[in-house]
């Protein structure tokens, strides 16, 4: 397949964005793009809308039109295994291990392992394992395993397994603690679930 030029990619994406009703600021970023790096910056700055809401690009489009090193420079991973400490975007079959204060947005069938104070937003059928004091927001049919002191907010039909001292805010009504002293705050049924171990639960008004 013939490689598209920068000008062709820019024109195509601007047309897609216009048809999808892009916001003025996001569209202007694309319009001002002078290189593929600028286009990728516009994509990552509007990642959720571009890849999930309007579906302007997917992993296949990115792989077909941008070099792997250009995607990596922008923090976008569509395949293989990567370790990151900065803002990153994982989709398709990518596996990302996030450390420190890294922020990862995961889509499709991406897999993320989050440590330290990393933050993950998981959509679609993404899988996340959260350790340390990592924070996860799970949407769609995302699957999360929370360990240590990880914090999870689960929405839609997300699935969460909570272990150790993890804390889960459950908007699905389907999540229960697995082991350790995990706490589930169930907003759907207005209940709190605790693996109490040897501790006695005292209710206070």
How would you describe each model-predicted region?
Residues 1-107, 113-115, 121-123, 129-131, ...:
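Short, glycine-biased loop/turn motifs at secondary-structure junctions and
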